[in-house]
């Protein structure tokens, strides 16, 4: 089960996602992963707690993984149009957006692996996350157009390998987007006016993309803040780990109901 926490920068997404990852680790095997290349998860969890795997992805590692997974396939496609030297794959792997797009695929693979009952996704600040999700959606739609174009150029190719690869990429992208549609997104905000405004914009953008916010969480919530949140978390003081443990022990995350019952291992 993939559970993601989204919201503007500075509202405490890492703290909240860490708290509920810790809570879920008591119910089943759990992983927490960040899509922020400057993640602070290891500051919260210097070592993995029992039942919880902390996964941080570095940009160079994600680019290298993309090259290993898709490098030969990209070369096969490009060679149908012009001569390709080995360095071109390195260039593509380091291009803006490639590592970010492949990161979502890695997170989905983590959930699909069956190794974990819960995968908690600590997203980057809202602008970066919305760009990431839109990139994934456009990638899928772009591949759909590519297939139609390549069908017109089919006679040019000496092999059906190119069409097979593009179809394979399209199916992979479709699978990733389907998983995002099934993901339980929790919108984290604070009670200040700017955070509430941006939370409303995030919710609107999610709806526009066909994704759904499962619940809203008010972090560092004041008594006068409107009472329309699934969870209201007061402001705590202490170290990052102490705050995470206080939230985890005092507030229960409401998981979505699947097939008439709560999704639990």
Regions found by a protein language model. Name each.
Residues 48-50, 174-265:
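C-terminal lobe/tail of nucleotide-utilizing enzymes
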């Amino acid at each position: 089960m993939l559970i993601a926490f989204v919201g503007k920068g500075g509202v405490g997404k890492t703290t909240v996602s860490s708290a509920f990852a810790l809570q879920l680790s008591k119910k089943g095997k759990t992983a927490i992963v960040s899509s922020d290349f400057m993640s602070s998860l290891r500051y919260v969890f210097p070592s993995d707690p029992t039942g919880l795997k902390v996964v941080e992805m570095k940009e160079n590692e994600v680019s290298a993984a993309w090259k290993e997974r898709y490098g030969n396939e990209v070369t096969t496609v490009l060679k149908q149009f012009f001569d390709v030297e080995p360095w071109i794959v390195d260039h593509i792997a380091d291009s803006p957006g490639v590592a970010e797009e492949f990161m979502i695929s890695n997170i989905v693979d983590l959930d699909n692996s069956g190794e974990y009952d819960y995968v908690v996704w600590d997203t980057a600040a809202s602008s970066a996350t919305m760009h990431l999700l839109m990139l994934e959606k456009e990638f899928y739609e772009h591949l759909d157009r590519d297939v139609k174009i390549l069908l017109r150029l089919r006679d040019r190719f000496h092999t059906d390998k190119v069409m097979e690869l593009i179809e394979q990429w399209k199916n992979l992208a479709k699978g990733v987007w389907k998983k995002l549609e099934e993901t339980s997104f929790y919108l984290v905000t604070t009670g200040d006016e700017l955070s509430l405004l941006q939370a409303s914009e995030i919710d609107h953008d999610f709806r526009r993309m066909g994704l759904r916010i499962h619940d809203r969480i008010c972090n560092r919530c004041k008594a006068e803040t409107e009472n329309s949140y699934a969870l209201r978390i007061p402001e705590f003081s202490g170290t990052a780990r102490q705050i995470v443990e206080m939230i985890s022990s005092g507030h229960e995350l409401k998981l979505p109901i699947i097939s008439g019952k709560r999704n639990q291992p």
